From Swiss-Prot:
CDD domains registered for this protein in UniProt: OAT_like
Protein name: 4-aminobutyrate aminotransferase, mitochondrial
Organism whose genome encodes this protein: Sus scrofa (Pig)
Designated gene of the protein: ABAT
Domain of life (superkingdom): Eukaryota
One term under GO cellular component: 4-aminobutyrate transaminase complex
Family (UniProt): Belongs to the class-III pyridoxal-phosphate-dependent aminotransferase family.
Enzyme category, top tier: transferase
Main subcellular location: mitochondrion
Record's keyword terms, sorted: 2Fe-2S, Acetylation, Aminotransferase, Disulfide bond, Iron, Iron-sulfur, Metal-binding, Mitochondrion, Neurotransmitter degradation, Pyridoxal phosphate, Transferase, Transit peptide
Cross-referenced NCBIfam families: GABAtrns_euk (TIGR00699)
Amino acid sequence: MASVLLTRRLACSFRHNHRLLVPGWRHISQAAAKVDVEFDYDGPLMKTEVPGPRSRELMKQLNIIQNAEAVHFFCNYEESRGNYLVDVDGNRMLDLYSQISSIPIGYSHPALVKLVQQPQNVSTFINRPALGILPPENFVEKLRESLLSVAPKGMSQLITMACGSCSNENAFKTIFMWYRSKERGQSAFSKEELETCMINQAPGCPDYSILSFMGAFHGRTMGCLATTHSKAIHKIDIPSFDWPIAPFPRLKYPLEEFVKENQQEEARCLEEVEDLIVKYRKKKKTVAGIIVEPIQSEGGDNHASDDFFRKLRDISRKHGCAFLVDEVQTGGGSTGKFWAHEHWGLDDPADVMTFSKKMMTGGFFHKEEFRPNAPYRIFNTWLGDPSKNLLLAEVINIIKREDLLSNAAHAGKVLLTGLLDLQARYPQFISRVRGRGTFCSFDTPDESIRNKLISIARNKGVMLGGCGDKSIRFRPTLVFRDHHAHLFLNIFSDILADFK
């Protein structure tokens, strides 16, 4: 399929690269690379098992005041640098998960440290304003230097938020207001609308819906949770909305061996999208918008072809639905383009696009026609954080200056090639290797083996993340280089060789 042609090309070239199959073959040593010792370490250093004794003690203390069962270990961020995360027991790990894909240019980047230390920036970091009513003098300037400098095609409007969930939540509200405005025309709010909205009834609160996909993750607030379908524990016991849920393609790998089957699978899913839009219109729960991730991340790193997304965009236009692309995890450069949807090759890729994580702040871009028609309709106290815009402007400068998008593409190719090698040698443990840039993943036989591999890797000095039922995902920073990929591949090759 077109969405991950790189995987196909690498798989084909791999078949001719027999040296990768030679027993004892090693990826080139990380020692051959030039390491900036002021920013990056030269490799992992493990002193205890993870979590170590200090982490376990702190976990006990935290568990007294909140459920701390999700905590992996406690970190020493003062000592963490570049691609390496250091814990409170002194263990230094190559971090290929980067705080759930949210660290853009590594830990404690010197340029960001310098920025924070500059006297003229002190007030920005200590005075957090209510941006909707009292923004600082340089607010527009910093937005232009940061977010607006990477605005996606066709979207000139921008609203900042604090996180991915509130970005999607407010994007939903924006879509609903846009849709109702289309229906209302130039008329003002009616007296009935103003009264019924206060008691959560129509017509003031119209019964619109957002179509989402099975396997999606869009956040944990009430509206977002209605479009999140990745893990039951995220949703259980919480009331939700009757909104349509379409199947997302489940592609078969290797892609070049299942072209016809995958095309049929995508066609089936697109047909179901259209059927659901029609069905919910008849139910008087009109689909006002469609939300989709360019790569379903939390749900298992599920890919679809570029053609699938182009056709999905066409469906949204045909039925008058807003098209919302959730780039919270895929945005920021890890796929080799700043926004993953750029791979689709569309001049009009979306009506609304949300972001967070690597972007340092949350928020969403949107077209002019989605602009709220009155103040306080999309609003909260902080509406983001100017200090994050300041940091992001420097992050974007570094991405451009160091050509980190090209780096993500190249280092990702090294990583993906190595994973295909490991898949060929250890098919009993690794399958469905896939990825775009460094945004890579593979499947394991089951959840138990997946979790065991992640745990062993952590104790060998490598941080990995899980997703879906049995997948391992890679979310390194943009300063993840070829030699970091080789280092990981050597360590993980040894793990697989000894795995029982």
